[in-house]
């Protein structure tokens, strides 16, 4: 499958369930992926899961790795929060997309950053995951849909916002099984 061929993406904190699911879908679609992982064990696990289409980096040195690469940046940036993403915006190509993936992205912050980057043609959106199955996540109340979500479901929503929702910016998409429904 080459849905994301010629696409370069950076997934910050990519060894959590959601980040790894995003990276896997990107790699399966033909993208070149840079991924950060905090520990040597996490880096080894991610490298084994993703194969040679992904480069797994230590968070302390990945900005140097980005600067040393051929090319002028990445097309897609996935990060948990604005403070994590902001220092990396210089590595995001004009016309690219930033998707925030933390459970509680503030809608006003997403809209403000979207307005700030609109002049570069960069779209900024967020997914807001609810109760997601993950190792060690413990018991959680079930949402109205009656089950916990899967990291893969959040990854699909994030990739939709990054690649297919080309006229959408400043949006926050709940992926919570109805928990946020009034």
Name these PLM-found stretches.
Residues 8, 15-16:
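Conserved glycine-rich cofactor-binding loop
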Residues 90, 115-116:
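Alpha-helical segment proximal to the catalytic Tyr-Lys
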